[in-house]
Amino acid sequence: MKANHIRILLLVTIAIMLISLMGRWEQTFPSNSSQSQTTQTQQDNSHYNSDTPATTNVSTSDAKASLTKTTSFSKYDDAKSVTINTDVFKNLKISLLDGAIISASLEDYSVSLDDKTPMALLTDEQGSEYIAKSTIVINKKPVDVNFESQGIKKENGKQVLTLTGSVDGLEITRTYTFDDAKYNISVSQNIKNTTSEPVSVIIDDSLARDFNPAGDSFSLLNAHSYTFTGVAYSTANDSFRKESFKDISKTNGQPTVINSQGLGWVAFIQHYFVSAWIPQSNDSKIYYKNLNNDVFEAGAYTGISIAPNQSESIDSVLYSGPIIKANLVDLAPNLEKTLDYGMLSFFSEIIFWVMNQIHSLVGNWGLAIILVTCLIKLIFYPLSAKSYRSMAKMRMLQPRVKRLQETYKDDRQVLGKKMMEMYKEEKVNPLSGCLPMLIQIPIFISLYWVLLESVELRQAPFIFWIHDLSMKDPYFVLPILMGISMFLQQKLSPAPADPMQAKIMMFLPVIFTFLFASFPSGLVLYWLTNNVISILQQWIITRHYQATHKK
């Protein structure tokens, strides 16, 4: 295959891989290749020896009433709630009914560049409700608990809210512990059985959200539509798995229960942010469901058996905040995988680490992208230089190529043979010009996901009109400059001998300008910087080669 054919194929491959394949791969095929451990009706006959004697391995039938019940958002009264403010949470409200967290805004993350209001991650706003709750199931029956607040205690940078309530002979004390600088909330429940009979209790920690999957549609011209929205979970049997809301909506209203033993977690993921319940018991079971229209729920339930006049405690952690690896890695095994860079995450994590180090020095993510690009070009300079020298030699051979084409224009087989003989004689590899592009493909894809998924770049400004590197250039200046740079780069490369190839190559800058117009401006900045450096390198090397190899 001719070198120009391969160049065209590689360019098209980049577009296809970015736009068609990579954008949906992680949603279509789970990251973990192991067989799914899910089942819709799972009976458990064995007891797991937990470190906490009070917990019991609850069967799905015991939790059936809770699993088949849809959350009613309307029952929570905003007026009957306790408000908490920390360094990271603003107006976090805990309802006195069931102790549900019905709203929480993130102090450090505004709604948009134009609206500096803290973004509401959890909300009780009608039509877009998203809450975290802990339901109590007594003897297989879910109950509502009307709590009373015992006040908030502040000490050592922490706030502790205590709620007390009673129902069906059980006295319940629930505490919420907030570290002022962290997004994780420790939830501890002490339940005392004041009756004369043993009581079976299930604690169902769950997330519930009103979400329309139809609105989460994929668009070629919206790079952010490639991101994942749905449920993620981790168990002892399945380290990390994702299920999109769109796929869950096709489960015909049946709850899915994951049969697992050992520590795990369950989460709702959206672009840049995650809410996750992390039970502290080895006997918790994970589930997710979509029983009613657009209400999606996911949670972890844990069973405890309480003897008469005895009390038992059970703990869990709720994380609700940005997807930042440093925040998640110590909370639970595999929780940091919610920062999912896709199949090339290994390279993406290296690129982000280097970018983050540079950003800590220069204080601007745009400059960090430019400097990372320069560093990448420096690392691969020996390969690029070899490629550009080969292309310069190919360019000098163009007159001979044209003569061969004129001589053997009626016999393409002989023409191909003669050209290969010429390349061999001149020690030229016609495919070497494709090497820089091959190298760029994994780097391009890795950086693409870094820019798309890293919350650190959300609303990160560059200069002048670029106020958010994670969004497209509002005036399309960078895509146009990138298209011009591609055109100039073509002019330095050997011209295709085939007129059809020449036309295709001529239109590629236009096509890519159109495609990149919807990409994050940070990604376009990388590609533009890469092209400019490549043009300078190629021009200098070509000029030097021609000057030293004149015949």
UniProtKB/Swiss-Prot annotation:
Q: What is the lineage of its organism?
A: Bacteria, Pseudomonadati, Pseudomonadota, Gammaproteobacteria, Thiotrichales
Gene3D superfamilies linked to this entry:
2.70.98.90
Entry-linked HAMAP family: YidC_type1
Species: Francisella philomiragia subsp. philomiragia (strain ATCC 25017 / CCUG 19701 / FSC 153 / O#319-036)
- Oligomeric and partner information: Interacts with the Sec translocase complex via SecD. Specifically interacts with transmembrane segments of nascent integral membrane proteins during membrane integration.
BP GO annotations: protein insertion into membrane; protein transport
The molecular function terms in GO held by this entry are: membrane insertase activity
Q: How does it sit in the membrane?
A: Multi-pass membrane protein
UniProt similarity note: Belongs to the OXA1/ALB3/YidC family. Type 1 subfamily.
Q: What does this protein do?
A: Required for the insertion and/or proper folding and/or complex formation of integral membrane proteins into the membrane. Involved in integration of membrane proteins that insert both dependently and independently of the Sec translocase complex, as well as at least some lipoproteins. Aids folding of multispanning membrane proteins.
Residue numbers spanned by region Disordered: 30-61
Q: Where is the composition biased (Low complexity)?
A: 30-43
Q: Which GO terms describe its cellular component?
A: plasma membrane
Q: Which Pfam families match?
A: 60KD_IMP, YidC_periplas
What is the disulfide pattern of this chain?
none
Give the gene that encodes this protein: yidC
Subcellular location per UniProt equals: Cell inner membrane
Q: Which residues cross the membrane?
A: 3-23, 361-381, 431-451, 504-524
Compositionally biased region (Polar residues): 44-61
Instruction: Report what the protein is called.
Output: Membrane protein insertase YidC
- UniProt keyword terms in alphabetical order: Cell inner membrane, Cell membrane, Chaperone, Membrane, Protein transport, Transmembrane, Transmembrane helix, Transport
InterPro entries membership: Membr_insert_YidC, Membr_insert_YidC_N, YidC/ALB3/OXA1/COX18, YidC/Oxa/ALB_C, YidC_ALB_C, YidC_periplasmic_sf
